[in-house]
Amino acid sequence: MNSIELPLLDRTAQNSVISTTLNDFSNWSRLSSLWPLLYGTSCCFIEFASLIGSRFDFDRYGLVPRSSPRQADLILTAGTVTMKMAPSLVRLYEQMPEPKYVIAMGACTITGGMFSTDSYSTVRGVDKLIPVDVYLPGCPPKPEAVIDAITKLRKKISREIYEDRIRPQRQRSNRCFTTNHKFHISRSMNTGNYDQGFLYQPASTFTSEIPTETFFKYKSSVSSHELVN
C-alpha cells in the first residue's frame, strides 16, 4: 500500500464527516422542511392551489401543508382580510411555534387591494396584524411567483441566526390599527400578551369620525355577535 495515500477506511471516514455549526444545521433543516399553514380567503389562493398539482409539485421543496398552526412554521396569507377575521389570523399566528415565517400573497393581502378604497371593514395590509417576511405582489400572482417567493424565504432562513431573530420579536412593540385605519403602537403580540378583543362601534358611528383607540382592546363584556361586521 502506498504510504502517501490514506487507507480506504480513513478516506471513507473523512468523506462521511460534516463540520458545521448548530445554527447552520438548524437553518438547513428548517429551510428544507417548511410546513405551511394555508390561510386563503379569495382568488389568490386558487393560484396557490395549482402548486399542489403535478405540474408544479411543490412537495419537492419539502412543503407539507398542515391543518394545525401548532405543527406549522410558515403561514401563507392569500386574499382579502377583513377586520372581523383579523383576530382569527393573529390567533393562528400566535399558536405557531418559533421560529415562524409569513408570506403575504397578492395585492389584497399586502395593501387591501381594490376592496380597501371604499370599505371600512378591510384590513389595509396584513403587516398591520402580523410581521411579514416575504411580500408577493400580483392580482393574482402566478404559481411561478409563489415558487420564487418560497425560494427567497429559503435563502433568508439559510442566512439568519436564531437568537437574532427571536430577540427583536420579543423586544419590539407591535403595530395595530384602528377602525379608521390609523396606526397605533401597542404591546408586542409575540410575547403572548397582546390584547385579544375587538373595540366595536355601533353602526351609527361609522358615519362620523371614530376615536383612535386601539382596535385590539380587550373587552370581556363584548360578545361574538356584537363584533363589527
UniProtKB/Swiss-Prot annotation:
It is found in: Plastid, Chloroplast thylakoid membrane. Binds 1 [4Fe-4S] cluster. HAMAP family: NDH1_NuoB (MF_01356). The keyword Transport applies. Keywords: 4Fe-4S, Chloroplast, Iron, Iron-sulfur, Membrane, Metal-binding, NAD, NADP, Plastid, Plastoquinone, Quinone, Thylakoid, Translocase, Transport. It comes from Coffea arabica. GO terms for molecular function: 4 iron, 4 sulfur cluster binding; iron ion binding; NADH dehydrogenase (ubiquinone) activity; quinone binding. NCBIfam families: nuoB_fam (TIGR01957), PRK06411.1 (NF005012). It comes from the Eukaryota. NDH is composed of at least 16 different subunits, 5 of which are encoded in the nucleus. GO terms for cellular component: chloroplast thylakoid membrane; respiratory chain complex I. [4Fe-4S] cluster binds at residues 43-44, 108, 139. SUPFAM superfamilies: HydA/Nqo6-like. Pfam families: Oxidored_q6. This is NAD(P)H-quinone oxidoreductase subunit K, chloroplastic. Its cofactor is [4Fe-4S] cluster. GO terms for biological process: aerobic respiration; electron transport coupled proton transport; photosynthesis, light reaction. NDH shuttles electrons from NAD(P)H:plastoquinone, via FMN and iron-sulfur (Fe-S) centers, to quinones in the photosynthetic chain and possibly in a chloroplast respiratory chain. The immediate electron acceptor for the enzyme in this species is believed to be plastoquinone. Couples the redox reaction to proton translocation, and thus conserves the redox energy in a proton gradient. It catalyses: a plastoquinone + NADH + (n+1) H(+)(in) = a plastoquinol + NAD(+) + n H(+)(out); a plastoquinone + NADPH + (n+1) H(+)(in) = a plastoquinol + NADP(+) + n H(+)(out). Its EC number is 7.1.1.-. Belongs to the complex I 20 kDa subunit family. The keyword Amino-acid biosynthesis does not apply. It is a peripheral membrane protein.
